């Protein structure tokens, strides 16, 4: 069912949330746009401005590593102070109410954690941009340290002092393997719920986009909240094409 208007959408969604025992949200870039973070695929989105740097390019070229870090710091300067929006805060309220055991997210902005959901209950399919790791020994580095080293080396990205490996933001680059642990945890969550909320995702990036159907085929109700149509709308029990923050705001408990 595609909700014909906002009132119908909010009423039906409220009923489904009330009736559910275990709710698993799956979030994409759309939940963070009201926080000032642009999405990737829409006109004016991040991919229309810069072609992504592939993982094999990052590994092969010092210049690519330098450019990757330059872009990351430019993004952090622009969006690093973003605060959780109404959608994040609504999901955090459902989490505190023990309706939501965990959140699956395609986002790398750390806003679910900032909203009050414990980091161990946020499954980040594409990683986290607020820190960096060595690709070889997994040593964690803070971004401020990387920036300081680059500033003192004329913009040259540093290697790991511990092992000499390449240091990269803790995100999944194009062409990089998906994190097996995160994918396994997401599958457990998807199969545990009786209501799956796909929020702000175009549902085109596989294998992550398979989780809504996995939950649906396991007997869960499926709700898709997204401004644009998705290829899974016909499988959903409720489709809401309205502003995400407006739809979820009534579920915020202060």
Predicted regions: what they are:
Residues 1-254:
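Conserved catalytic core of sirtuin-type NAD+-dependent deacylases
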